[in-house]
Amino acid sequence: MINPIYLIIADLLDRYIGEPPEKLHPVVFIGNFVKFLEKVFPSTHSVEKLKDLVFGFITVFLTVFTVFLIFFTLELILNLISNYYIKLFSYSLILSFSIGHKSLLEFSKAPIKYIMSGDIKSARKSVQHIVSRDTSTLDEKHVISAAVESSSENITDSIIAPLIYAAIFGLSGAFIYRAVNTMDAMLGYKNEKYRYYGKTAAYLDDILNFIPSRIAGILLIISAPFYGGKIVPAIYGYLKEGFKTPSPNSGYTMAVIANSLSMELEKIGCYKLGKGEITVLKAVNSLKAVDYSVLLFLVIYMVLYFNLIY
């Protein structure tokens, strides 16, 4: 377990300063490395299923192993720094690159702001950046829903999960998680090219998100009163609707947000979560839930850490 001060500073750096330029971003490097491995071990587009499975596995293994070596070595180097404050800042700064707190909020706020100004066309284009569905014909209600779904789901992927793995395994844990999450985003499709090639990445992402997604859901339940939600409906959503999405993990945070704020989130033809009118105010409150759930996680981790260590 690492000192919670590292996690707090890392999250604050990302929340208020944001991510580094693309050329310096470790996650961008990971993505480029995966693209390189795809060329070395290419997909057969499901023509040779076993070959796709093997090459997909090799791509995931080499990526995870490389990320582990880099960040484990980096952590060893940081531990050699004798000045506490230099080490604290350096470690926290690097760790902040594994978190997407500010970007999550910015991307989710954008379509909501366009809706508030009455610009539905720009809202559709904006929300297309954060969801995979076709948004070109979505009405106002479904644009807001897509934005809330994205922010709710990505509480786990972008913040809570990296912090959990950092807390337990340090830098290498946080960045291995981000590597797997990145590979799932790049390879985890059920189309001809990735149906078999991306299975390892998709399954590993499901495994690594299983516990963090459920912890994130519980954090959202406990913090519900702070973002304008209700605890009892949130619990109902967690227990009764968390499993309704195609992903085994993404539904828990979305169902809690939907039910705690009494609004229906709908991906047309796929799922419906919660009941009630979806409004801009409720969407804004759902974004507040991001900050409160992260704050609660950091407080709980700090209490656990100092009680276990001292």
Swiss-Prot record:
Places the protein is found: Cell membrane
Q: GO CC annotation: what is one?
A: plasma membrane
Q: Could you tell me which NCBIfam families the record lists for this protein?
A: cobal_cbiB (TIGR00380)
Which pathway, metabolic or otherwise, does it act in? Cofactor biosynthesis; adenosylcobalamin biosynthesis
Q: Which keywords does the record carry?
A: Cell membrane, Cobalamin biosynthesis, Membrane, Transmembrane, Transmembrane helix
Q: Which GO terms describe its biological process?
A: cobalamin biosynthetic process
Q: What is this protein called?
A: Probable cobalamin biosynthesis protein CobD
Please indicate which superkingdom the organism of origin belongs to: Archaea
Explain the purpose of this protein. Converts cobyric acid to cobinamide by the addition of aminopropanol on the F carboxylic group.
Gene Ontology molecular function, alphabetical: ABC-type vitamin B12 transporter activity; threonine-phosphate decarboxylase activity
Where would you say this protein principally sits, based on its record?
membrane
The record's listing under Pfam families reads: CobD_Cbib
Extract the InterPro entries matched here: Cobalamin_biosynth_CobD/CbiB (IPR004485)
Coiled-coil blocks: none
Write out the transmembrane intervals.
53-73, 80-100, 157-177, 215-235, 289-309
The membrane topology term of the UniProt record is: Multi-pass membrane protein
Which protein family is it in?
A: Belongs to the CobD/CbiB family.
